[in-house]
Amino acid sequence: MAIIIGSDAAGKRLKDVIKTFLKDNNHEVLDVTERKDLDFVDSTLAVVHEVQKNDKNLGIAIDAYGAGSFMVATKVKGMIAAEVSDERSAYMTRGHNNARIITLGAEIVGDELAKNIVKDFVEAKYDGGRHQIRVDMLNKMC
């Protein structure tokens, strides 16, 4: 499993903080916006397309508020994403909704909160079972 991360210019500093945190915790991290100054549309699409290459990959897209990246990610067929700004939502969206991408707002969450959000998202496992009905409903919408 790889954690795919990307940001627009507004999210670059927070992206670097999260990337270091993930690597320090022995996660494989792929930064798809390492040398680019992309718009949130392009940076999020880069994350989504890389996540789609492996069913085990997870993604993190960062912009100023998280909303733009969320809107982009959810436009892609079969992609379930959540805009999160707290640890519980990050954990639950993975466990109950099988979200593969979270979006964060660099102007919304601070460094320590972002690390905790990412930790809970990455460590959570999809529960399946009764939650699969909802996931199937989401996927039928595309």
UniProtKB/Swiss-Prot annotation:
Broad class of enzyme this protein falls into: isomerase
EC number: 5.3.1.26
GO terms for MF: galactose-6-phosphate isomerase activity; ribose-5-phosphate isomerase activity
Keywords tagged on the record: Isomerase, Lactose metabolism
Pathway recorded for this protein: Carbohydrate metabolism; D-galactose 6-phosphate degradation; D-tagatose 6-phosphate from D-galactose 6-phosphate: step 1/1
Catalyzed reactions: aldehydo-D-galactose 6-phosphate = keto-D-tagatose 6-phosphate
Top-level division of the source organism's lineage: Bacteria
GO biological process: D-allose catabolic process; galactose catabolic process; lactose catabolic process via tagatose-6-phosphate; pentose-phosphate shunt, non-oxidative branch
InterPro entries named in the record: LacA, RpiB_LacA_LacB, RpiB_LacA_LacB_sf
Sequence similarity: Belongs to the LacAB/RpiB family.
PANTHER family with a match to the protein in the record: GALACTOSE-6-PHOSPHATE ISOMERASE SUBUNIT LACA, RIBOSE-5-PHOSPHATE ISOMERASE B
Oligomer and partners: Heteromultimeric protein consisting of LacA and LacB.
Protein's recorded name: Galactose-6-phosphate isomerase subunit LacA
Species: Streptococcus mutans serotype c (strain ATCC 700610 / UA159)
Record lineage: Bacteria, Bacillati, Bacillota, Bacilli, Lactobacillales
